[in-house]
Amino acid sequence: ILGNDKDVEAAVYAAKKAFNIFSNFSKGDRLKLLENLLLVMEKRFEDLAKSMTKEMGAPIKFSRNSQADSGIGHLKGFIESLKKQPQREVISNGDILVREPIGVCALITPWNWPINQITLKVIPALAVGCTCILKPSEHTPLSAKIFSEIIEEAGYPPGVFNLINGDGPTVGTLLSKHKDVDM
């Protein structure tokens, strides 16, 4: 079933509402959620690999060794990067650089390398305290569905991550033009 304008409105509303709380999570709290996410992704590794074989026709060995594994590798890299990232930094001219979440992020991913693309967009947004609406390719929705289950099991609050299946001309366009989507 493809999403529509009502689904987009519901997801944007949920993400905007959740942003008010999630954007105030400490770096430590966000790291804990990312570490939980890693544990659940590792536990659901085979489900991710099988979903990409089913939805894309990739050989299972390739799905395991390259596709599903890339998502876990990216997640580990983002965890390490966040650990080193200062929230405030004095730059060379004396100004203070403050890093803060931008808001609601609408993330649209292609059919190829689905978990790779999802993790490269969703994880950095969650790491810095943004809320997300993911619209995966309508041709590869299975891995995104499993990823949404992983997010929920990892303990992210409701509304922080939202999944809408739909096509680009409908859901993609609505998300891209929505006044309450910040990025």
PLM regions and their residue ranges:
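Rossmann-like NAD(P) dinucleotide-binding subdomain of oxidoreductase/dehydrogenase enzymes
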Residues: 86-183
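N-terminal Rossmann-like NAD(P)+-binding subdomain of aldehyde/semialdehyde dehydrogenases
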Residues: 1-94
